């Protein structure tokens, strides 16, 4: 019997042993099979997570940020222990002792889930396993993935420290609110750095690890608090905090940004605008979208915050003034359902959800509001973010909207969403009433930059970025009209003309495939023989066309492309009047080269870009400072900047043209609206039917330009470059010169100054004086004799006829570099559009 029993148990033992051996061999085979072609865990040592790219102003303040995944990388040594412990207690309490997998943890998690009936659930995967899943494997719920995860976890634990593993985990994990990693989550939920988090706040972040979408701190408040409290209890059990601290933190309410207890980080930044969005557009093109949105770039913008604000307000004021003068009421086009108006919480919630502009501060902040009632003499409104008080009743008196056309009761209805702002007293700022506003249909752009460095100081691409993201400074290509004429005059001055050269202002007829083209001056008058200076000051079209014919449109085309106004300009005469399309960005950049004496300068919105490691990968400024390293320069001496920029225009030509453009401001088409206390030059531009109006002007330091027009071109009633854009330039520059100053334009050594009669172009004596006298710069050898210097392409006599056809002769002239050139009837007549006017 004993022998039988021994034999029976021996057989069982043998079978068990064989079973264990077979299981071991099977497991070994499985692990060998799945462990052959696993991803290399060594890539984790070169972990470069997707991180936020941030834009800073010159003062080092963050003004915008861009991210595919909003992540702020923090090394393990800078992550507070309380944060690490919170996640360990929530996700992997044996993290610091297990070899990558945790049998006890799996069993304990299952027991807790059963005991709590599913209310207390912690992950069965270790933190190491989660790292493997997130970095090297897919998220498939398959046995194969779990086996690979286990194998990789064991391997990684052998080569990486626990701190290295938890660094990967805490920087990669998604925690809701577009927050990746604990640092971004701490900012999103509490607007705090990690070092300032309380145990309860750290516990809430850890609670989000498994179900970030189901534990919103407002919408799922009770669930969020329950899960936070579970983590706090675990932290006490694991010995990371005391029972007293755990109890105190569990009793505290959950306060977050989302519940309104803390200001959001985004609220500390200015609203996104045209400037930073253009940086996004340009750098995404230059660096690639992946690097821009995920590379953790540090971008130093050129923007001057005060001037940017002034650019916004100056342009907005001009656009609103024109819109209100038209009297058309359009509103926002948004409405709120009538049933929501009965309850304040309902209409406030509905109003907050609407996509209406909230970035306008013209005359004070503009608020979205809903019309709650249309009464006989007023609109009763509800204003977003503002509680009604006896001192500030939320009504708009009917008298406030007398500027509108149409019937009061037809213009408004209950539920209409409108924009309003406070009207306040100029003397003491006290509240007067709420006043109705609207985003204009007419649009425009403004841009200002440093003439020497190309640094764009301000850029406004429309009335409101939130209303329309189209940047009309860089993306809207429109006809510049007469704002292009300086490039025709530059070509002429470099071809032997002088500011005193006489050109005939007389009718011209040109036979084209589309018919006979008869260009005219804006005044529909002809002025006969006229000096070049007067031609540009008064924006004479016929003189410009004659110049373009004489110099040759191929030469004008070359100048326009050299200055960057166009990439490929058609060599047609109508283009000399600004008939081809360009952008404000290009035109302002081109004018800067007049102002700086003819050196190439490229507009830039960015001073420098640094990568995630702090290495500079782009710097705009290429000039070098010769003596900046000297501790102290002699009194009155400034550092010497060695310019290595290309010269694209003769310095004398640049000065002559600048002087002539000063005349535009002093007595020409901009004289009524531009009047600064420093020397100023510029040119107006107005196209046919006033569909586009421009003004581009400059001082010795800053060049700025304005464009106004409808996105779908149509006439601006009574519009002109001087009348519409001149005031925008004036308001902006009044502010700019306070900071940047201004002085006389630099005079080249080659200039010989001679008194000229600006009406006749004749040379005057050195002692001549009067309104007709202007001191003109001439190159050596080009000084006129006493009398009048005529354009050699036209026969001039006492009985000069107003010719209607161009001469058929050519002539030799001396250009600015001393060489000779042949000019004459070189124009090529192609398809002609209407072109510019004045």
For the regions a protein language model found, what residue spans apply to each?
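Non-catalytic, structured segments within soluble enzyme domains
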Residues: 119-384, 547, 561-562, 566-568, ...
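Active-site beta-strand/loop architecture of penicillin-binding DD-peptidases
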Residues: 273-291, 444-479, 490-491, 595, ...
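Active-site-proximal helix/loop microenvironment
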Residues: 253-254, 263-268, 302-304, 562-628, ...
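Active-site SXXK
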Residues: 87-88, 235, 311, 376, ...
């Amino acid at each position: 019997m004993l022998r039988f029993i021994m034999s029976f148990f021996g057989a069982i033992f043998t079978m068990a042993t064989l079973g264990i051996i077979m299981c071991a061999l099977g497991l070994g085979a499985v692990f060998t099979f799945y462990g052959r072609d696993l991803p290399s865990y060594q890539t984790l040592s070169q972990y470069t997570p997707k991180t936020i790219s941030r834009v800073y102003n010159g003062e080092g303040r963050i003004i915008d940020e861009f991210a595919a995944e909003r992540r702020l990388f923090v090394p393990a040594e800078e992550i507070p222990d309380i944060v690490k412990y919170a996640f360990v207690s929530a996700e992997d309490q044996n993290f610091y002792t297990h070899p990558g997998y945790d049998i006890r943890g799996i069993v304990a998690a299952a027991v807790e889930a059963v005991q709590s009936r599913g209310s207390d659930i912690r992950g069965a995967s270790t933190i190491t396993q989660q790292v493997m899943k997130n970095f090297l494997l897919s998220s498939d719920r398959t046995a194969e993935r779990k086996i690979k995860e286990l194998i990789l976890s064991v391997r990684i634990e052998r080569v990486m420290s626990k701190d290295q593993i938890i660094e990967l985990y805490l920087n990669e994990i998604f925690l809701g609110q577009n927050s990746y990693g604990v640092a971004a989550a701490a900012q999103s939920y509490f607007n705090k750095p990690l070092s300032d988090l309380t145990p309860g706040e750290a516990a809430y972040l850890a609670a989000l690890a498994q179900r970030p979408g189901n534990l919103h701190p407002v919408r799922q408040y009770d669930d969020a608090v329950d899960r936070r409290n579970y983590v706090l209890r675990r932290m006490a059990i694991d010995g990371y905090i005391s029972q007293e601290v755990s109890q105190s933190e569990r009793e505290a309410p959950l306060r977050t940004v989302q519940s309104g207890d803390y200001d959001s980080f985004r609220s500390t930044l200015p609203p996104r605008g045209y400037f930073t969005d253009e940086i996004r557009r340009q750098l995404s093109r230059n660096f690639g979208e992946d690097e821009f949105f995920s590379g953790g770039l540090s971008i130093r913008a050129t923007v001057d915050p005060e001037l940017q604000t002034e650019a916004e307000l100056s342009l907005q004021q001009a656009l609103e003034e024109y819109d209100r003068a038209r009297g058309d009421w359009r509103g926002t086009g948004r409405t709120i359902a009538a049933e929501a108006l009965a309850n304040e919480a309902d209409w406030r919630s509905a109003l907050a959800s609407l996509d209406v502009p909230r970035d306008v501060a013209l005359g004070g902040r503009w608020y979205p509001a809903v019309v709650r009632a249309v009464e006989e003499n007023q609109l009763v409104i509800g204003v977003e973010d503002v509680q009604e008080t006896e001192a500030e009743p939320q009504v708009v008196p009917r008298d406030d909207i007398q500027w509108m056309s149409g019937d009061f009761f037809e213009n408004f209805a209950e539920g209409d969403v409108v924009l309003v702002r406070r009207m306040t007293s100029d003397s003491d700022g006290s509240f007067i009433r709420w006043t109705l506003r609207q985003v204009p249909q007419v649009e425009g752009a403004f841009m200002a930059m440093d003439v020497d460095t190309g640094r764009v100081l301000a850029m406004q691409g429309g009335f409101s970025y939130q209303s329309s993201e189209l940047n009309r400074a860089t993306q809207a290509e429109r006809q510049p009209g007469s704002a292009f004429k300086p490039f025709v005059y530059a070509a002429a001055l470099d071809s032997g003309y002088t500011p005193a050269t006489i050109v005939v202002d007389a009718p011209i007829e040109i036979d084209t495939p589309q018919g006979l083209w008869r260009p005219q001056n804006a005044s529909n008058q002809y002025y006969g023989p006229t000096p070049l200076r007067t031609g540009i000051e008064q924006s004479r079209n016929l003189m410009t066309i004659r110049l373009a014919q004489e110099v040759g449109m191929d030469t004008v085309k070359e100048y326009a492309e050299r200055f960057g106004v166009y990439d490929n300009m058609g060599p047609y005469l109508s283009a000399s009047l600004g008939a081809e399309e360009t952008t404000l960005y290009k035109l302002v950049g081109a004018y800067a080269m007049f102002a700086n004496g003819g050196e190439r300068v490229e507009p830039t919105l960015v001073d420098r870009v640094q990568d995630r490691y702090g290495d500079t990968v782009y710097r705009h400024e290429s000039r070098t400072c010769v003596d900046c390293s000297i501790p102290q320069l002699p009194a009155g001496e400034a550092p010497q900047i060695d310019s290595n920029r290309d010269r694209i225009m003769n310095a004398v030509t640049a000065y002559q043209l600048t002087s002539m453009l000063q005349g535009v401001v002093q007595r020409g088409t901009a004289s009524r609206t531009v009047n600064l206390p420093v020397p100023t030059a510029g040119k107006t531009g107005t196209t046919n039917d006033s569909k586009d109006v421009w003004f581009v002007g400059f001082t010795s330091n800053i060049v700025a330009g304005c464009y106004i027009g409808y996105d779908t071109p149509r006439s601006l009633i009574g519009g002109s470059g001087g009348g519409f854009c001149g005031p925008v330039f004036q308001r902006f520059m009044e502010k700019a010169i306070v900071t940047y100053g201004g002085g006389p334009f630099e005079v080249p050594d080659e200039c010989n100054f001679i008194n000229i009669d600006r009406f006749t172009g004749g040379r005057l004596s050195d002692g001549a004086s009067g309104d007709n006298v202007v001191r003109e710069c001439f190159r050596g050898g080009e000084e006129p004799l006493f009398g009048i210097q005529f354009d050699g392409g036209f026969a001039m006599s006492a009985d000069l006829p107003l010719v209607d056809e161009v001469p058929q002769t050519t002539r030799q002239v001396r250009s600015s570099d001393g060489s000779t050139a042949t000019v004459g009837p070189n124009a090529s007549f192609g398809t002609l559009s209407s072109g510019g006017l004045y």
